[in-house]
Amino acid sequence: QSLEWVNRWFGNHRSVVKAILRVTGKEKKTWHIIDLGCGGGDLALAVAKSLSRHKIECTITGIDGNANTLAYAEKKCAAFNEISFLQADILDNQFTIQPCDILISSHFIYHFSADVLVDFLRNNLPAVSTAIIFSELKRNRFAMRLFKFSSFLLPISKLAKEDGLLAIKRSFSEKEWLAILQQAGIGTYSLQSVPLFRILLTSYPARKI
């Protein structure tokens, strides 16, 4: 719930939804979206609501390794038949996603090391027909200091504060993202800095440079 509050009030959901809308455009189809590391389902729910308002049909599969978190997500999203959830160990090197149109993730990719992320992208690119959209923290010293001094003012749990610091420490810089994308063989992408201290990656695996 703490992470949901942060994502909502700091605009993370909005930036991901806007990126999805740019990808879908006016094409009439049912888009299959996979939410990697979906947590409590707040991003999947925000996406489903927004696409519904824009009269865009979709199915969303949220994937996470925590059974308790998924139970919470299923309860919260019960009224949305287009959302389903799957429990899986995403960090297992044998894990692969099912075919989808769009792969999204928010505040999860920092769990990967750079080498493992490169392998994950290489192994899963063939399953994504249209776009990959990741919204992640961008590592820098100022973000670390600001979070340390301001987190006590935020209505979030101690666990969420600790997770936030860990996420900043383990997140990738823009330079590291460029190296990861090159090694993964992704040539068509955009890296956009968005508030606060985040990177929004939109990549198009099927497009040629």
Residue ranges and their predicted role:
Residues 112-124:
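A short, conserved alpha-helix within the catalytic core of class I
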Residues 104:
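A conserved beta-strand element that flanks and buttresses the S-adenosyl-L-methionine
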Residues 1-18, 23:
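Class I SAM-dependent methyltransferase Rossmann-like catalytic core
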Residues 174-204:
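Conserved Class I S-adenosyl-L-methionine
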Residues 108:
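Hydrophobic adenine-recognition pocket in adenosine-nucleotide-binding enzymes
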Residues 34, 40-42, 47-92:
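Class I SAM-dependent methyltransferase SAM/SAH-binding core
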Residues 137-181:
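C-terminal alpha-helical "lid/dimerization" subdomain adjacent to the S-adenosyl-L-methionine
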Residues 128-137:
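Conserved beta-strand signature within the Rossmann-like core of class I S-adenosyl-L-methionine
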